[in-house]
Regions:
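Active-site metal-binding core of divalent-cation-utilizing nuclease and nuclease-like domains
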Residues: 25-54
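Charged, alpha-helix-enriched surfaces in structured cytosolic catalytic cores
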Residues: 4, 8, 41, 70, ...
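Short, well-ordered secondary-structure micro-motifs
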Residues: 37-39, 72, 104-106
Length: 120
């Protein structure tokens, strides 16, 4: 399994989140599993904590080489489970090498920020 896209994102997202949202990353961005309310493991590609204006922000992200509408729908479903076990505000992000314009528009309408690998 390759994690190149995620590994690039871990290094560059702190700068991008500061630039775009004024969020300072306070807890290293990592890949890990968390348990949902049913006790099932959920893989989180990008997870960490940030801060904006003294308020804690949970950074939750998914990495997909070629982002599709289906990936966004799956991520939105996963976010529902995550919100049940993580307190506080969540900033959902997706990182990708490429996607179609309408897919990025859909993500933005759903409140998901999309970052491209060329921004890293």
């Amino acid at each position: 399994m390759r994690f190149d896209l995620e590994n690039q994102a871990y290094k560059s997202l702190p700068r991008l989140l500061e630039r775009d949202f004024g969020i300072t990353v306070k807890e290293r961005l990592i890949r890990r599993f968390i348990k949902n309310k049913k006790g099932e493991s959920l893989e989180i590609n990008i997870i960490g904590k940030g801060e904006k204006d003294g308020k804690e922000i949970n950074i939750i992200g998914e990495a997909k080489t070629n982002l599709s509408l289906r990936h966004i729908e799956d991520f939105l479903d996963r976010l529902k489970d995550i919100r049940e076990v993580i307190d506080g505000e969540i900033l959902p992000i997706m990182v990708t090498h490429m996607t179609e314009p309408e897919v990025e528009e859909y993500a933005l309408k759903k409140g998901i920020k999309v970052y491209y690998s060329y921004e890293f």
